[in-house]
Amino acid sequence: FPTLNNLAWTNKGPILLEDLDFVRIQTKLEGNELTVSHVDKFPYLVNYHVPAGVRIAAGAQVRLGAYLGEGTTVMPAGYINFNAGTVGNAMVEGRVSAGVVVDEQTDVGGGASIMGTLSGGNDHVISVGKKCLLGANSGIGISLGDGCTVAAGLYVYAGKKVSLVNEKDEPVNVEGDVVIDGKNIVKAS
């Protein structure tokens, strides 16, 4: 990643930053305008490829190198980085960082964040299983299996202490056996 250059992504294609002023003047002399959409290592996905069967409400929110499975919706505040994406129909209203895989029928709620390989996840690929819900403004730094819900505003990261309970709100251990309160606390991993 550090070896990639930041480029000016323009209506005339990518331009090295050191050449930008020259190209701007040349374009002006030709009677045209040079429009710079952004300066970054990656362009927007939709400027080069639009995956079949997806909805991307704001093209600037999905970088080239992201993978979107058919049926995925990325809302205006949603964001998907390069080397990240969705396997099938998913709703993305939050941030999906580099190196993250989100499975089908999962909703990344508004303002939710999934920590990736560039934001503290290191080389661990974080995956979110099928039919999961990350509530508004929640976040994770660990992988989740199928059917998980992270409450709005809650951030779960590796090493965070988590209390386990069953459907009756009784304290349980990792095997699901009812235990005394306090014996149901584990570290997320």
Regions found by a protein language model. Give the residues of each.
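Short, surface-exposed, charge-dense and proline/glycine-enriched linear segments
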Residues: D21-N32, G99, Q105, T117-N122, ...
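C-terminal segments of enzyme domains that contribute to small-molecule binding surfaces
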Residues: G121-V125, K130-L133, A158-S189
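A structural motif detector for beta-strand N-caps
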Residues: V54, A60-V62, A66-L68, T72-V74, ...
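Terminal amphipathic alpha-helical/low-complexity segments used for targeting or macromolecular assembly
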Residues: F1-N47, I185-S189
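Short, positively charged
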Residues: L45-V54, D123-V125
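A mid-sequence, solvent-exposed acidic-amphipathic segment
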Residues: V46-H49, G59-R63
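Short, Lys/Arg-enriched charge-dense amphipathic segments
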Residues: K12-K28, G110-L118, S138, D146, ...
